């Protein structure tokens, strides 16, 4: 029997990445009742332990680019609770930030599957609990699409913009001359640690990436156990959303190929 739960709130936030988390916490502190719908079981999106793309990278080299506000608040709490900078503990820091706000109802492991409108006004969104098998119908005065891929636009036929804008579009002198469809790509999380076993034969589906990796990094002298492989990214020049399965296959093959290449040339053995 289908279990449907109806929820009323002031603001429904779709997506629990850093933008969705900040939107939910800020709104809750302003007194709004918030429902946060996140299709993963951890918060943070690409900054979570699932992908491990650390936030505020520019601030490491240029202090004036360091973000303040809620991001700084999270960074300070992370230093206090997580001095070893462990990503699993970072997940806990983000989770604590949300559950500490009594005005937020988090729905983790729930994915947005539809929306209803009255004219051009969104009245509710539908979500599906991937583990609980609960269906949620969330009614709100306001909705924030922080999914990263404009998932609500798919359900309500809203106009969206994708790609890189031109200089003339918003008066940005540092933008490119012509707009195009280039977006962020897809990746998969890869980490290496020093092992004790002799290098194993490469898997049959891998390729030798010696030339391509060496072009970017000194294979023999890099600290591979501290590398997060942010440069393994695919699909930005394609439809990174609707062709995600294809790009996932490419990313997995590239990850194992890079690992085999490093094992071959680095001088140390690594476990993946």
Can you name each region flagged by the protein language model?
Residues 4-17:
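Beta1/beta-strand and adjacent pyrophosphate-binding region of the FAD-binding site
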Residues 8-11, 30-33, 101-105, 121, ...:
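Loop/turn elements at helix/coil->beta-strand transitions in domains of secreted/extracellular proteins
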Residues 14-17, 37-40, 109, 128, ...:
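Active-site-proximal beta-strand/loop segments in catalytic clefts of secreted hydrolases
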Residues 20:
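N-terminal Rossmann-fold NAD(P) dinucleotide-binding loop
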Residues 26, 32-33, 37-116, 161, ...:
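Conserved N-terminal/central alpha/beta ligand/cofactor-binding core
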Residues 46, 109-112, 121-124, 131-142, ...:
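Flavin (FAD/FMN)-binding glycine-rich loop and adjacent Rossmann-like elements that form
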Residues 76-85, 124-126, 238-241:
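Helix-loop-beta segment of a Rossmann-like dinucleotide-binding subdomain
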């Amino acid at each position: 029997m289908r279990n449907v739960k109806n929820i009323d709130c002031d603001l429904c936030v779709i997506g629990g990445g850093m933008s969705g988390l900040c939107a939910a916490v800020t709104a809750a502190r302003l007194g709004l009742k918030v429902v946060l719908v996140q299709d993963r079981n951890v918060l943070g999106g690409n900054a979570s332990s699932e992908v491990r793309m650390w936030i505020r990278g520019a601030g490491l080299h240029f202090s004036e680019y360091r973000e303040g506000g809620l991001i700084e608040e999270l960074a300070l709490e992370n230093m206090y609770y997580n001095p070893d900078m462990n990503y699993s503990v970072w997940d806990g820091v983000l989770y604590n930030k949300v559950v500490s706000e009594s005005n937020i109802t988090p729905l983790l492991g729930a994915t947005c599957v539809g929306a209803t409108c009255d004219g051009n006004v969104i009245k509710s969104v539908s979500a599906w609990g991937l583990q609980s098998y609960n269906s949620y119908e969330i009614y709100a005065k306001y909705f924030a699409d922080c999914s990263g891929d404009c998932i609500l636009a798919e359900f309500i036929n809203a106009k969206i913009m994708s790609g890189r804008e031109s200089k003339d579009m918003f008066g940005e002198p540092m933008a490119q001359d012509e707009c195009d469809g280039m977006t962020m790509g897809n990746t998969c999380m890869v980490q290496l640690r020093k092992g004790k076993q002799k290098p194993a034969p490469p898997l049959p589906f891998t390729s030798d990436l010696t030339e391509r990796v060496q072009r970017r990094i000194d294979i023999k002298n890099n600290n591979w156990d501290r590398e997060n492989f942010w440069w393994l990214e695919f699909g930005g020049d394609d439809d990174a959303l609707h062709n995600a399965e294809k790009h996932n296959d490419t990313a997995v093959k590239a990850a194992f190929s890079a690992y085999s290449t490093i094992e071959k040339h680095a001088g140390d053995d690594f476990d993946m």
